[in-house]
Amino acid sequence: MDFKRVSYLGWCFVLVLVGLWMVEAKGKDEEDDDVVVHEWKEYSAVYNFGDSNSDTGTFSAAFAAVFPPNAQSFPGNLLPKRNCDGRLIIDFICEELRMPYLSSYLDSIDSNYNYGANFAAGGSSIRQTGFSPIHFGLQISQFIQFKSRTMALYNQTSHTGVDVPVKSRLPKSMDFSNALYTIDIGQNDLSFGFMSSDPRSIRSTIPDILTQFSLGLQHNFMTLVLVLLQQLFKEGARFFWIHNTGPIGCLPRQNMVNKTTPEDLDSAGCRNFENEIAQEFNKQLKEIVFELRQKLAPAMFTYVDVYSAKYELIKNARNQGEYVS
């Protein structure tokens, strides 16, 4: 495939996201067709959590090098760190906020965390069982350690009056509560389920997956999601930008690993079953976001419909001069 065209497709996707940039999800009792548009806010930093959709160096630092064609159209043509020929959505978000690209928390070479850090890792999932050991809960633990060590350094230097050069590569202690927390995770939980168990049982695992996600933001897959998000809230996070999962049934590997018949596909050539599961996941994720908005009232939660943006690009690829095979 022509990678210049792929980059063009990526730009189209970003334009769709920019259209959603400051759109906040509304509550269950409000009309879905309505949106609330907020004024532009200046964030002091960005902290990202997720999988290969937003990994800017964790996998390459922790496990194995990322080889071309990855990064071949990345600005500066640097050492490949992303599973993408160019920039990821998180890169465009940083550009839009006029910030440098995020350094991976585990990348020890030439990293700068003055404007945030990236904890996402290729293959990561919400639950601990998956393709990668760096699951969502561990990413949050890494963030907590990062914040704790940063705060300790500032406290130490404030008492001694001695400035430490490394502070120039770290965020200010007050930046954590004024940062944007971006999250794009969950696709690997579903993909791992498709590969390792009866596909028809995947739907029943979604509530457990999202429980763990919620626990991470607060403090168990819908319950874990809830707990994890609450955990981030306890650490001072107030501005959340949460992507739903993409159309998994449109991934080429789904047609490669499954015996596919024409009846299994929709008009865009995507597998119906996998996409139905993804849509069910997104429906429950959206409900979790609404619940968190009510529970954690001071915080702002923005739910981003990445599924629709990606599906429309895939469905209309020919109209954009791109051929998808």
What does each model-identified segment do?
Residues 2-325:
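Conserved active-site regions of diverse hydrolases
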